[in-house]
Amino acid sequence: LATDLITNGTTRVCMFSSLHTDATLVLMDELERAGVTGYVGKVNMDRNGLPGKLQETTEESVQETLRWLDACHFEHIKPILTPRFTPSCTNELMTQLGKLANERGLYVQSHLSESTNEIAWVKELHPECSQYWETYDKYGLWKDHTLMAHCVWSDERERAAIRDAGVVVVHCGDSNVNICSGICPVRRMVN
């Protein structure tokens, strides 16, 4: 992967790895040795996954994230906290990740408003939040340099919250077309 990135002219990345700590460290090492710079995140998810395979317990997720952070000694590839998205993280996990982000000065990346079904699901899980973005804000994960993937269905209020907080929208048109989730209103965001 790292060599392919360089061969194709990609020299900077911001990537989701997996919830597996050792695999994430291997990816980071490969990227570092290939000369790629950027951020890689060990994915956190303690609900709505596949228990034992693609889902950790809250305690495992926090402990493995700490182990991963303590092992990150790369010069050009930096760690970024990566709660997969609100539906895959319990309140306790989001609280712990928010503390880590603030204590260690770490950037955060996740998903936001990828589809209307996802937004409805988040409302079911967090009826106390009137908007999806608030589920990150309440845990200290909505801040300057937070990266949010997709943002296809972000309304004017959410776009204002993105702008006001200094959150960065990361959008890949091919990805959203592939999963038929919609087209990000990039022009509205730029204006």
Residue ranges and their predicted role:
Residues 2, 28, 94, 98, ...:
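Short amphipathic alpha-helical segments and helix-helix/interface helices
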Residues 1-23, 87-93:
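Divalent metal-binding segments
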Residues 22-152:
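Metal-coordinating catalytic core of metallo-dependent amide/deamination hydrolases
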Residues 1-3, 65-71, 158:
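Short, charged beta->alpha transition segments
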Residues 12-16, 80-83, 147-149, 170-172:
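Short catalytic-loop micro-motif centered on adjacent basic/acidic residues
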Residues 10, 105, 166-167:
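A structural motif
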Residues 141-191:
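Active-site-adjacent C-terminal substructures of enzyme catalytic domains
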